[in-house]
Every structure is written in structure tokens, then in C-alpha cells.
Amino acid sequence: MYLSSRTGSRLLFLVKASFNTFEKVATISSTLIYFVSHKLVSSRSCSHNFRNICGYIRHNCRKCIRFCFCTFSIKISLPLVIARRIEY
């Protein structure tokens, strides 16, 4: 399912996936994180606390793109957790 964001980017929600560097898809305790154009990250579940989500996003962002040291702003809007890259 695709949802349009305010910036025109898309969020993709998947039922099942494993970590894939090329597609930039990762799982976290059955919660799916999807990197779209390296700008948005979304999670279907809010079962993880703020610190864990932030750390997981940063870790996998750097894992996908090794030179990346992005800072993210996190917005929790049930049932989504959305992280936006705000700087390099």
C-alpha cells in the first residue's frame, strides 16, 4: 500500500521482509522499516520506544549507505512512526 507524504515521497508498507541492502528494507521484531529515497523511514508498529526506533534507524541508515551520518526527526502518529532525515 502506498501513501503520499507532504513532500511527495512515498511510504511502502510490506507484510513480510528481511534486510535487503539494495531495497533498503529491514525488519525489527516483526516491525517493518522501509527507506524510501533515503529520506523517509516508516514503521507499522509503535511497540518500540523512541530511543530504540532512533537507534535502529541510524544504524541501518549507516549500514545501507556507509558514509551516512544523518540526523532524523521522529514523528509518532498511530499506527505509524515516521522519521525524516533533517541533516547529513
From Swiss-Prot:
Disulfide bonds join 46-61, 54-68. Keywords: Antimicrobial, Disulfide bond, Fungicide, Plant defense. The keyword Disulfide bond applies. GO terms for biological process: defense response to fungus; killing of cells of another organism. Belongs to the DEFL family. This is Putative defensin-like protein 315. The lineage of its organism: Eukaryota, Viridiplantae, Streptophyta, Embryophyta, Tracheophyta.
